[in-house]
Curated annotation (Swiss-Prot):
Transferrins are iron binding transport proteins which can bind two Fe(3+) ions in association with the binding of an anion, usually bicarbonate. Lactoferricin binds to the bacterial surface and is crucial for the bactericidal functions. Has some antiviral activity against papillomavirus infection. N-terminal region shows strong antifungal activity against C.albicans. Contains two BBXB heparin-binding consensus sequences that appear to form the predominate functional GAG-binding site. Glycans are attached at N385, N491. It is an enzyme of class 3 (hydrolase). Keywords: Disulfide bond, Glycoprotein, Hydrolase, Immunity, Ion transport, Iron, Iron transport, Metal-binding, Osteogenesis, Protease, Repeat, Secreted, Serine protease, Signal, Transport. SUPFAM superfamilies: Periplasmic binding protein-like II. This is Lactotransferrin. Monomer. Found in a complex with LTF, CLU, EPPIN and SEMG1. Found in a complex with MPO and LTF; interacts directly with CP, allows Fe(3+) incorporation into LTF and activation of CP ferroxidase activity. Residues 25-348, 360-689 form the Transferrin-like domain. It comes from Sus scrofa (Pig). The gene is LTF. Residues 1-19 form the signal peptide.
Length: 704
């Protein structure tokens, strides 16, 4: 523990100011017992990390206090983390459970019953139930989500509490509306106004409270977490009197929670305001407190312990440490799509759930892609919708959250998406110059050549002398425009100082004002300079070539067909109208130059084709929709060009590459590693060591 937990706690502390903040962190508590523990904590840590204790009546009241800047932090269960998102709060630190050898930032939601009764999970109607609290993960959202199909509930606007009150004969659901639905509070035993209270003032509140409701024979089933039985019954002989209800309508011993649980749930998290939330001060408070008062350092005051008969005050007693949550992660990313879907299912009608599942949402990067996507949607006979993001990474995040379902990505971003758990669905096969057949959905993808293009008149530049010239890139993290050329240069120089390779550059997605953005021009009004979308005129393959053609740069990193697609009358835009392909040449790795038609013999690397990506559970639906759309609007589709063409753009390469012949099936390459190939994956992994990607950092946290 002494080695492990400090290492976890140190994660993300680089650059953190270790000095005590001028104003302390105000911690929100919800009961007399929590307030007492908080005051002890305050007195023990005040010399290094001043803090204050703010009392409110419920977790929701704490959320509101933090949003109103009357408090700064509170620990919440996943269901309340979701609620906090609506108040613009985000999780900043996750509780770590388990052991030093097997740490985890999740727990299992389980349904516990006593042995000797033969009912199963699908036979709970009319039983007496014990819950941790309304809107909480293990005690409400997960079990009620699973039981929804058994409820007499059509969905909003009818209250869900009303349906649950009719389903169980009696319950204790702390935080429920006992006046409107007395059955939900019938089993609770708090005195007076504390009956069914949303805090430990109600004895059956929380995990241990719900279990005691079962243990004392008040209820028939308790919805808690996997460790609750172990924490309350340390003797195996006592635990053996209980069992778990499994989703397959069987029962298993309480030790079998990994095989018999209702869901895996993200651990409790400390939340703060998304903006001006004192995140660094909160983390430093947790970091110092865990070192001094954690389980590896026995003291009179224990941060992860509760005095007397109390349980889980401020933090879960089972916590062994904290893990800093990357700044890119908001509440929805933290909770994950399966949990978000479960919560959504409790807030929608059956028809709304079905409609949401039936549609496919395509993510468009920038306004030009959105315009094309909407044209596509208006012509499509399928349930196709569009969402907008400013960057490719933001689109990936939308797909992760379920706000979008698919998009087509270059190989560099396929790597990023794959690291985040997304999968390739269909590949963009380039238009074949050897065949005009439309029967190529099953043709294996061959990729394309990443090339370095220069003006023929600029004869002094070779690959060996390219350093110090002015460069034009498609965008940061894209294959031909960034990953391949910069990877080669890193290998040659041993340096990760990208902004020193070239005298000036346009690499959309770089830090604004940096050398890597010096050549970028933004849109026609000079706005959005260096943004990684079509608002930047030098973005993408065509944009990078335009940067070269307009004499802004000396070398453009693009793909083999880019010059041919934009010269000799192929691009009628004013800037390209008079361009000729023989005015440009390719730089070869051996220091020679060749005509742009000889990319096969003069290229930097073979790059994997662009591909459509989606979530694994949505991939089959996305594939079916796209193959149907392709038959109608593809290069050989019956309604292209009369109504709409997938592979044509008013500018260039919107949604898909314009030279795509067909979206082809993957021939078994259904993971990002298989699709990209081990050589490319290794090369990108090595290049990523040169810089920190907030999205990859976030995905590493989520995939842990």
């Amino acid at each position: 523990m002494k080695l492990f937990i400090p290492a976890l706690l140190f994660l993300g502390t680089l650059g953190l100011c270790l000095a005590a903040p001028k104003k302390g962190v105000r911690w929100c508590v919800i009961s007399t017992a929590e307030y007492s523990k908080c005051r002890q904590w305050q007195s023990k840590i005040r010399r290094t990390n001043p803090m204050f204790c703010i009392r409110r009546a419920s977790p929701t009241d704490c959320i509101r206090a933090i949003a109103a800047k009357r408090a700064d932090a509170v620990t919440l269960d996943g269901g309340l983390v979701f609620e906090a998102d609506q108040y613009k709060l985000r999780p900043v630190a996750a509780e770590i459970y388990g052991t030093e050898e097997n740490p985890q930032t999740y727990y299992y939601a389980v349904a516990v019953v006593k042995k000797g009764f033969n009912f199963q999970l699908n036979q709970l109607q009319g039983r007496k139930s014990c819950h941790t609290g309304l809107g909480r993960s293990a005690g409400w959202n997960i079990p009620i989500g699973l039981l929804r199909r058994f409820l007499d509930w059509a969905g909003p606007p009818e209250p869900l509490q009303k349906a649950v009150a009719k389903f169980f004969s009696q319950s204790c659901v702390p935080c429920a509306d006992g006046n409107a639905y007395p059955n939900l509070c019938q089993l609770c035993i708090g005195k007076g106004k504390d009956k069914c209270a949303c805090s430990s003032q109600e004895p059956y509140f929380g995990y241990s409270g719900a279990f005691n409701c079962l243990h004392k024979g008040i209820g028939d089933v308790a919805f808690v977490k996997e460790s609750t039985v172990f924490e309350n019954l340390p003797q195996k002989a006592d635990r053996d009197k209980y069992e778990l209800l499994c989703p397959d309508n069987t029962r298993k011993p309480v030790e079998a929670f990994r095989e018999c649980h209702l869901a895996r749930v993200p651990s409790h998290a400390v939340v703060a305001r998304s903006v001006n939330g004192k995140e660094n001060s909160i983390w430093e408070l947790l970091y110092q407190s865990q070192k001094k008062f954690g389980k590896s350092n026995p003291q009179e005051f224990q941060l992860f312990g509760s005095p007397g008969q109390q349980k889980d005050l401020l933090f879960r007693d089972a916590t062994i440490g904290f893990l800093k949550i990357p700044s890119k992660i908001d509440s929805k990313l933290y909770l994950g799509l399966p949990y978000l879907t479960a919560i959504q299912g409790l807030r929608e009608t059956a028809a709304e759930v079905e409609a949401r599942q039936a549609k496919v949402v395509w993510c468009a990067v920038g306004p030009e892609e959105l315009r094309k996507c909407r044209q596509w949607s208006s012509q499509s006979s399928q349930n196709l919708n569009c969402s907008l993001a400013s960057t490719t990474e933001d689109c990936i995040v939308q797909v992760l959250k379920g706000e979008a379902d698919a998009m087509s990505l270059d190989g560099g971003f396929i790597y990023t998406a794959g690291k985040c758990g997304l999968v390739p669905v269909l590949a963009e096969n380039q238009k074949s110059r050897q065949s005009s057949s439309s029967d190529c959905v099953h043709r294996p993808t061959q990729g394309y050549f990443a090339v370095a293009v220069v003006r023929k008149a600029n004869g002094g530049i070779t690959w060996n002398s390219v350093r110090g010239t002015k460069s034009c890139h498609t965008a940061v993290d894209r294959t031909a425009g960034w990953n391949i050329p910069m990877g080669l240069l890193v290998n040659q120089t041993g340096s990760c100082k990208f902004d020193e390779f070239f005298s000036q550059s346009c690499a959309p997605g770089s830090q604004p004002g940096s050398n890597l953005c010096a050549l970028c021009v933004g849109n026609d009004q000079g706005v959005d300079k260096c943004v990684p979308n079509s608002n930047e005129r030098y973005y993408g393959y065509t944009g990078a070539f335009r940067c070269l053609a307009e004499n802004a740069g000396d070398v453009a990193f693009v793909k083999d067909v880019t010059v041919l697609d934009n010269t000799n009358g192929q691009n009628t835009e004013e800037w390209a109208r008079e361009l000729r392909s023989d005015d440009f040449e390719l730089l070869c790795l051996d220091g020679t130059r060749k005509p742009v038609t000889e990319a096969q013999n003069c290229h930097l690397a073979v790059a994997p084709s662009h591909a459509v990506v989606s979530r694994k559970e949505k991939a089959a639906q996305v594939e079916q929709v796209l193959l149907t759309e392709q038959a109608q609007f593809g290069r050989y589709g019956k309604d292209c060009p009369d109504k709409f063409c997938l592979f044509r753009s008013e500018t260039k390469n919107l949604l898909f590459n314009d030279n795509t012949e067909v979206l082809a099936q993957l021939q078994g390459k259904t993971t990002y590693e298989k699709y990209l190939g081990s050589e490319y994956v290794t090369a990108i992994a090595n290049l990523k060591q040169c810089s920190v990607s907030p999205l990859l950092e976030a995905c590493a946290f989520m995939m842990r």
